[in-house]
Amino acid sequence: MSSTPFATFAFALIACGKLLESNALAIIRDDHSIGFYFNAHYKPTNDATNTTFGSLVSVTSESDLEYLGQVNVGGHDFNLVLDTGSSDLWVTGQQIKINSETSDNLNLTYGIGSASGNIAYTTVQLGTYQVQNQAFLNVDKTYQQGADGILGLGFISLSMIEKKIKTKAARPIMANLFEQNPTTPNFMALALERTTDNENTSGGAITIGEYVPQFKDVSGTPKYPLAPSTSSRWTIALSGMQVNGHDVTLKSVVKGAKKGTAISLIDSGTSLAYIPSNAVDAIYGAISGSIHIQSNGQNFWIVPCLGQANLSFSFGHDYLPINPLELTRLATFTDGNTQYTVCTSAFRPQLSSTGSDMDFLLGDIFMRNVYSVFNFGNSTSNNDDDKGASIQFLSRSNKDQVYQDFQQQRTQNLKNLPPLYDLSKIHSDGTSSDGGRVNS
């Protein structure tokens, strides 16, 4: 339980492994700051000297695949995926202090992977916030899940645990946290940091009920309501997409979506973005020299590593530019006995598991370009789940500057990697003239 009415918990984003390029955000603390200062380094730091708040949770970024927050569950610290795309809490692999355990078994299925176990109750601590008797899934079996667990940051109506046992403690942790701290405004704000390819760099923050000071102007930005209005997820209406200044046609398969819009899930638990095929082709077809690979169930693009497109999205007001570094992922492959570097598309055609409740799944490669505020509305009430819920964005990408800096940043990072492959040798099935194969 927080001792201050506007308590927050912050996450230091630590990059591990091969990451994307850019400068790390430095959140500078002052006497009124809820943030903390951090620099590039190779190990997480919990240095909160002279900060004005008592809650600090470290976060790591595993090869830009997922953002992990250190959360204490039942007396043990776990590195949990911060996931706005789901609502349940689960952990695995350790003996923890459990208040009580049920005989209710549950299997949670995600776009990739699953986790199963029994529902139990324990104390959960997020920074200085402590939620007593929180229901969670005590997992004993996982499939394609690399982290210690997932911290779902979505609505009650999406919680599989709450549907299973129908108790107040079974609601998602954010709903219980806001109810136990009624003076705290019920929103969370999230900044995901981009890091350089070959460095481990900290940066970024998540706060509850307050904004990081240098992003406080987000309070005056438009609030985009959930769309459709019956949505149980963090989905909003995408009203515009442009590539090099040209509009991309938007259509929706979602019932209730307005004509000319597409329903977009803003999902911190997904690394890339999964969007309609025509939108993918519009992005990479605009980059000269790109090759569309369609073979053996794969559907992606190989892109010149120094090629770029001007991509931006609008949700009803100004267009939000996407840093061109986000459009591709650096990869290596072996042709003969030699390793080479290629760049593959980061915006991918929709997964079959995306479902009919969204058209665009915008993950971390979108969220790193904005400061995102998730307003829960009345979502702490079972009687009025997500009425009034909305999302706000403040752009973090200066359009002119990011395009100007792209060549320099990408060139610098390529210096530490194997040589670029000659893309003229790659066929549309992903094979090369010399017998190698590039996979997504």
Task: Give a label for each model feature.
Residues 4-24:
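Cleavable N-terminal signal peptides of Sec/SRP-targeted secreted and luminal proteins
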Residues 20-35, 314-440:
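Aspartic protease catalytic domain
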Residues 23-225, 282-308, 352-353:
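Non-catalytic N-lobe/flap surface of aspartyl protease domains
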Residues 62-76, 238-261, 347-354:
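A short acidic-Thr-Gly-centered motif at the start of a beta-strand
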Residues 74, 81-87, 265-271, 278, ...:
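A short acidic Gly-Thr/Ser loop motif
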Residues 140-150, 216, 227-235, 328-343, ...:
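Short, surface-exposed linear segments at secondary-structure transitions and domain or protein termini
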Residues 201-261, 335-337:
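Flexible, small-/acidic-enriched active-site or ligand-binding loops
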Residues 253-272, 279-282, 290-294, 310-312:
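Extended serine/threonine-enriched, polar tracts that run as long, contiguous segments within proteins
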